[in-house]
Amino acid sequence: MKIHCCVMILVLIAGSILQIPIWKWCVCFCLFGLVMALELVNTAVEAVVDLVTEEYKPLAKLAKDAAAGAVLIAAIMAVFAGVAMFAPEGMRFLQEVIG
């Protein structure tokens, strides 16, 4: 979760520098919320599984892996969406800085 928070701070800084439009801010905040909500669900699933059993059980592993996989998929999709949204402003910024 610390990595997600650090990335969120970097996105906020980049968005401010690039002056992205308001709708892109809205999408960014929705994606932040989605990833963080899934992190909380993942934490809850892991805590409940650990509370129920301390021994290895295939279904417990499946529950933990599925919850972690949901976070991973959401984070990867957020990165793809972020790259697509920031690309035009990023290219414009680079052209102004370089040329």
Give residue ranges: language-model regions.
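Hydrophobic alpha-helical transmembrane segments
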Residues: M1-M36, V52, Y56-P58, V71-G99
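Amphipathic, hydrophobic secondary-structure cores in small proteins
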Residues: E39-T43, A47-L62, A66
